[in-house]
Each structure stands twice: as C-alpha cells, then as structure tokens.
Amino acid sequence: MDPEISEQDEEKKKYTSVCVGREEDIRKSERMTAVVHDREVVIFYHKGEYHAMDIRCYHSGGPLHLGEIEDFNGQSCIVCPWHKYKITLATGEGLYQSINPKDPSAKPKWCSKGVKQRIHTVKVDNGNIYVTLSKEPFKCDSDYYATGEFKVIQSSS
C-alpha cells in the first residue's frame, strides 16, 4: 500500500460531511454535540440558522455547549460559562468591550479580537443535519483544545 495515497485519502475523509442528527431534534433542544472525524463540535440552532464550532472555548477549554446565547452589538454570541468570553456564532470572533482610559465618561464600545473559535459548515438535507469540518488553513486558538495533547476525546486504537 502506498503511504502517500493513504495520507491523501485520510485528509480527504476528514473533510467529508457527517450526519450528526435530525433537524427536528436540534430545533427542539436548540443545540447538540457531536464528534465529527474525531473532533468534538457543538451545533446551535438560533434565530432560524444553524451554526457549528469547536465545543471547547478558545480561552481555557470551557464547555461552550453549556453556555447561553446572547446578542452583543447586534451579533449572536455564545457566552462561555467559565469566564464569560463572548464568541460570535457566525464567524467565531471573540468580542470584548473597549474603554478609553483618557475619557472615563466615554461609553464602552464592542470590538473584535479576530477569529478565535473554529467554525464548521452545517447543511440540512432531507431533515438530516450534516457538519463538515473547516478547511480554513489558518490556526484558531480553539484548535489547541480540539487537537493534540489537550484533546478531550481519544481516538480508538
């Protein structure tokens, strides 16, 4: 067996869609967790849209599936239950409130830290929910908790 072909096949397989459940189930619960190609993800149903991201918060590995969804600056965010970090459902950006120390009377404004949480693609087909892992080449802070030594789930040997 050619090891190069095997590695290519494994890489392709990692980006195939995986059925994670039924649409009717997630609409009731508004969230669900799944393992997609050995990566734990959480899928949210919020305001008529589906969103999927790594299950562990980029900051300290908090369980995002246990967080509340709130709107900040017109963006729907999951709030990590451990340290209250705010992550946009649509883009995975971390949000924070900026305060100008030279003008204490100024109102704090919402700012982005950039993309911190890896977002995955969700598709609905014939009542089934499918998740495809992100192929984006950049590193996200949440990758630290989804891969390598801090990975929460173990692959079967």
UniProtKB/Swiss-Prot annotation:
Record keyword Acetylation present: yes
Keyword Amino-acid biosynthesis: no
Modified residues (Phosphoserine): S6
UniProtKB keywords: 2Fe-2S, Acetylation, Iron, Iron-sulfur, Metal-binding, Phosphoprotein, Repeat
PROSITE patterns, per database record: RIESKE
Cofactor: [2Fe-2S] cluster
Gene3D superfamilies named in the record: Rieske [2Fe-2S] iron-sulphur domain (2.102.10.10)
Residues annotated as domain Rieske: 16-127, 17-131
Residues bearing the modification N-acetylmethionine: M1
GO MF entries: 2 iron, 2 sulfur cluster binding; metal ion binding
InterPro entries for this protein: Rieske_2Fe-2S, Rieske_2Fe-2S_sf, Sol_Rieske_ferrdox_dom
Pfam (any one): Rieske_4
Transmembrane segment boundaries: none
Note on cofactor: Binds 1 [2Fe-2S] cluster per subunit.
Positions annotated to bind [2Fe-2S] cluster: C57, H59, C80, H83
Protein name: Rieske domain-containing protein
Organism: Mus musculus (Mouse)
Protein's gene: Rfesd
